[in-house]
Structures are given as structure tokens and as C-alpha cells.
Amino acid sequence: MAEITASLVKQLRERTGAGMMECKSALVEAKGDLTEGEVVLRKRGIASAGKKASRATKQGLIGTYIHHGGQLGVMVEVNCESDFVARTDDFQELVHDIAMHIAAADPKFIRKEDVTEDVIEKEKDIHKARALAEGKPEKMLDKITEGRMSKFYEEICLLEQPFVKEATLTVGQLVKTKIAKLGENISVARFVRFKVGDAQGSDSGSETPAAE
């Protein structure tokens, strides 16, 4: 049996969004095999968040977070399927954590699919021009640009960002762990971030499912 290392547990967690202890337990049962570990989690219903993500979310909470002595604030709407789940400590903690994350990380969109075409094209042009200025071969431009766009999405899309309290997880993966634990679909509907002196603020501007 392969040794169950922290690195192996982390890899399974990144693949499935399951918790550390759940991943370790699955790997022990799977004798250290990553693929089999995924199967174990799916059988337990822990890695099945994707199936729940198509279900309607009509309940939920509005969460707020105020930071820096009232100089920075966030309001976020997170939805779930039932009022029962909305009242649980796990769901309320998730809403608070997402609001806090938005305050710290300042995302502009909820997910990659929300980024407008004009923003995408402008960013691609910038990365292509930068690659050319660095002397990169023209035939490699598309590949280089694609890699840099992935980093760009991580910077501006809430669900792609590393979670501020645990950087080994993205916010999207965090949501999936809660979907698996609570047994209901959960979606981030919208958010707005206010900062004193910033007249525009940050507004997600859409109601978009958090995990698919």
C-alpha cells in the first residue's frame, strides 16, 4: 500500500472538494490509490456535488461583513434549497466566510463564465503583446496566453480564487464541500463590495450558480 502522505490527501481534496479527514479515510480504504479514492468518496456521496448543482436554490441568506473600522463592507446573497439548511451553522458559516473572502480578495465576477467578452479579449491582447515583447515565439503565443488567462481568472473570479482562510482550496471547492456535507445545492447569487472613497465599488452583477 502506498504511504498516505499529506500531499496525496491534498491532491484528492483538490480533485473532489471533500474534507481532509474524509480524503485521508478514503485513501486508506483505497490503499493509497488516488483514482480509487475518488471512487470511494463518490460511493459515500461526498464527491457528488456536481449532481446536486443543477437543483433549484430558492432559499438562503444575505450575509454581510464589515472590516477596517467601517471603511470596507460586503453584502453577499448565498442560496440553498431549503430554509432548514439556511438555518444551519454550517451554511451560516459559509455565507460569513464568503463575505469575508470577498472583502479581502476583491473579486469582480462570480465565475469565469460571467467575464464579459470585451474584458477577455482586452486581457488576451495584453498577454500576447507582453509575450511578444519578451521574445516568445509567435507559434507559442496562444498557449502562453491561455496559461496567463488562467491566472487572470484566479485573480478576478470569486469561485476560482484561493480561499483566504485555506489557500489549498478555491472558493468553488469550499462551496462543493458544503454541498456534499449538507446534501443540497448551494449557489452564490450576487455580491457587492463597498469601500469608503470608492464611488463605484464592486458588483458581481449577476445571479450565477456557484458549482456545477
Swiss-Prot record:
Pfam family, one: EF_TS
Superkingdom of origin: Bacteria
Region (Involved in Mg(2+) ion dislocation from EF-Tu): 82-85
InterPro entries attached to this UniProt entry: EF-Ts_dimer_sf, Transl_elong_EFTs/EF1B, Transl_elong_EFTs/EF1B_dimer, Transl_elong_Ts_CS, UBA-like_sf
GO cellular component, one term: cytoplasm
Location relative to the cell: Cytoplasm
Gene3D superfamilies, per database record: 1.10.286.20, DNA helicase RuvA subunit, C-terminal domain, Elongation factor Ts, dimerisation domain
Molecular function as annotated in GO: translation elongation factor activity
PANTHER family associated with the record: ELONGATION FACTOR TS, ELONGATION FACTOR TS, MITOCHONDRIAL
Name of the protein in its database record: Elongation factor Ts
Organism: Solibacter usitatus (strain Ellin6076)
